[in-house]
UniProtKB/Swiss-Prot annotation:
The keyword Protease does not apply. The gene is rimP. Belongs to the RimP family. NCBIfam families: PRK00092.1-2. This is Ribosome maturation factor RimP.
């Protein structure tokens, strides 16, 4: 985790706790010539734009007040909901995703695939099982949790 992400996580957590919001993810990424500091937040029932603006304003005030500046380069601050394809980071995210359609990225390919989508039907501390449609049939596939690089909710077409 970069120092910018760590700093922002520490700064935003009390703001979110005060409002009963949840921190989903903080990322600091360069896209083209620009840096983006993205803070994804949520709450029970979903977060709205006014709540995102409130958190953005409070976080911006805290960042601006720090000396020395914890993020010396210019960047764009974005505070938003995680959206329909919310990342699955914490154990509670996975538990809430049981029965839902998800996308997983694997470190090592399984059956020649590193990107797999299916309905999460079971999980435990070591593995998760997806119901995956392959051509015209549905098959249950089990994956080691340690082989999962990323997971997120997915939209099924």
């Amino acid at each position: 985790m970069s120092s910018a992400v760590e700093t922002v996580t520490k700064l935003v957590t009390p703001i979110l706790e005060e409002q009963n919001f949840e921190l989903v993810e903080v990322e600091f990424v360069k896209e083209g010539k620009n840096w983006f500091l993205r803070v994804f937040i949520d709450k029970e029932g979903g977060i709205d734009i006014e709540e995102c603006a409130f958190v953005s304003e409070k976080l911006s005030e805290k960042l601006d007040a720090m000396d020395p500046d914890p993020i010396p380069q210019a960047y764009f601050l974005e505070v938003s909901s995680p959206g329909a394809e919310r990342p699955l980071k914490k154990e509670s995210d996975y538990e809430q995703a049981v029965g839902k359609y998800i996308h997983i990225s694997l470190y090592q390919a399984v059956d020649g695939e590193k990107q797999i989508e299916g309905t999460l039907v079971h999980l435990d501390s070591e593995q998760l099982t997806l119901s995956v449609k392959i051509k015209t049939r549905v098959k249950e596939m089990t994956f080691e949790r340690k082989n999962i690089a990323k997971a997120r909710l997915a939209i099924q077409f």
